[in-house]
Amino acid sequence: MSTEYGIALGMIETRGLVPAIEAADAMTKAAEVRLVSREFVGGGYVTVLVRGETGAVNAAVRAGADACERVGDGLVAAHIIARPHKEVEPVLTMEKK
């Protein structure tokens, strides 16, 4: 996978898969972002990650968080990192063992 250093990262963590799917759908419809990952964290928590330009990621995460809240009590956290440091990138692409 090529490096995406300098491209914003948006994250939404949910309780359950349904709010995560709703958030992912809303994020990709709201702005020009790329859905890069879905992680099953454990205990029913799911994290969805998107990448794109900072403004687009900001709009996408807001839309995803709103959609997730409409599904019920699914939203745990929503966060944006405008320009992740290059040392963070390997953590995002680690393969599961």
From Swiss-Prot:
Gene that this sequence comes from: csoS1B
Subunit annotation: Homohexamer with a small central pore.
Purpose: One of shell proteins of the carboxysome, a polyhedral inclusion where RuBisCO (ribulose bisphosphate carboxylase, ccbL-ccbS) is sequestered. Assembles into hexamers which make sheets that form the facets of the polyhedral carboxysome. The shell probably limits the diffusion of CO(2) into and out of the carboxysome.
UniProt subcellular location: Carboxysome
InterPro entries registered for this protein in UniProt: Bact_microcomp_CS, BMC_dom, BMC_shell, CcmK-like_sf, CcmK/CsoS1_BMC
Database matches in PROSITE patterns: BMC_1, BMC_2
GO CC list: carboxysome
Protein name: Carboxysome shell protein CsoS1B
Classification lineage: Bacteria, Pseudomonadati, Pseudomonadota, Gammaproteobacteria, Thiotrichales
UniProt record similarity statement: Belongs to the bacterial microcompartments protein family. CsoS1 subfamily.
Domain notes: The tight homohexamer forms a small pore which is positively charged.
GO BP terms, alphabetized: carbon fixation
Domain BMC span(s) in chain numbering: 8-93
Keyword list, A-Z: Bacterial microcompartment, Carbon dioxide fixation, Carboxysome
Disulfide bond entries: none
Pfam families (alphabetical): BMC
Protein source organism: Hydrogenovibrio crunogenus (strain DSM 25203 / XCL-2) (Thiomicrospira crunogena)
